[in-house]
Amino acid sequence: MKRPREPSGSDSESDGPIDVGREGELSQMARPLSTPSPSQMQARKKRRGIIEKRRRDRINSSLSELRRLVPTAFEKQGSSKLEKAEVLQMTVDHLKMLHATGGTGFFDARALAVDFRSIGFRECLTEVIRYLGVLEGPSSRADPVRIRLLSHLNSYAAEMEPSPTPPGPLAFPAWPWSFFHSCPGLSAPSNQLAILGRVPGPMLPNASSLAYPIPGLRAAPLRRAAGTILPARRNLLPSRGASSTRRARPLERPAAPLPAAPSGRATRGSHMAPLLRSPSPVSPGMVGSPAYMAVPAPRPSSPGLAGRPAGAMLCRSWVSEITEVGAF
């Protein structure tokens, strides 16, 4: 089929008719040679789904790393599940805080691992304190073994603390003893802390080491007792009896004679009589609070004790008793 060409503006151009069928062939050659088959379309959709799944996995993995690296997100991880927007917001806040405090923006892997270890140790210590408080009940008398155990764990937590020494004094309360203020049903914190100053022994820290565990703020390192933490059985019973008697008296009581001891302690008084006759020098490590100086008065039936002064006899008897039963 041929059609006549439209007349052009110039009469000098005279071309023949144009073949329409040949134009159709040229247009088909310009198109793609073949359309995609259904199997090819299905394979393309499958590849696209795999790529999308890998992208989501990378996003979730990065969010998990942010939950572990950002301190605020790590603390809230156990309470409830954090959303992605919350994790990103906490990350932004943490980076702003680092920028405001002059941080470099890089994480020290070793310091981060030590910090996580100290956080876990403090959580375990808090759980131990809670369990021992519930197990002992609301009584005002605390076990000396429990006091020594908590003092040892507190000193070990102080050694693990990676934070540097601040220039000024601490502005926050002592830890972990502030746990007693927030837990109802436990014994009074004043009784717990007062017992710490009355229980003698090499494992008892001083007042400066009971503060928040920062190594630079402690006056001297804690001396560890040779052997196990718990005392031997032969020293446990008299020490517990002596410590329970000392806990029953207030700290402010002066060194004065008390009424006669009950009949249950007669054997113990007769056992201590040879030690009372021999003078023993007072070591500087044994000097304690005035509660250590209050002892039962000697009975008139004891021979050989009437001719000695009352003050010297009280001091020497108490020091000899501590020397025999051993510092708990």
From Swiss-Prot:
Annotated spans, Disordered: 1-54, 236-272
Compartments (UniProt record): Nucleus
Domain named Orange: residues: 116-153
Pfam families xrefs: Hairy_orange (PF07527), HLH (PF00010)
Domain bHLH, residue spans: 43-98
Entry GO terms, CC: nucleus
Region (Transcriptional repression and interaction with NCOR1 and SIN3A): 42-111
Keyword Transcription: yes
Subunit structure: Self-associates. Interacts with GATA4, GATA6, HES1, HEY1 and HEY2. Interacts with HDAC1, NCOR1 and SIN3A.
Family indicated by similarity: Belongs to the HEY family.
Record PANTHER family: BASIC HELIX-LOOP-HELIX TRANSCRIPTION FACTOR, HES-RELATED
Record's protein name: Hairy/enhancer-of-split related with YRPW motif-like protein
Originating organism: Bos taurus
Gene: HEYL
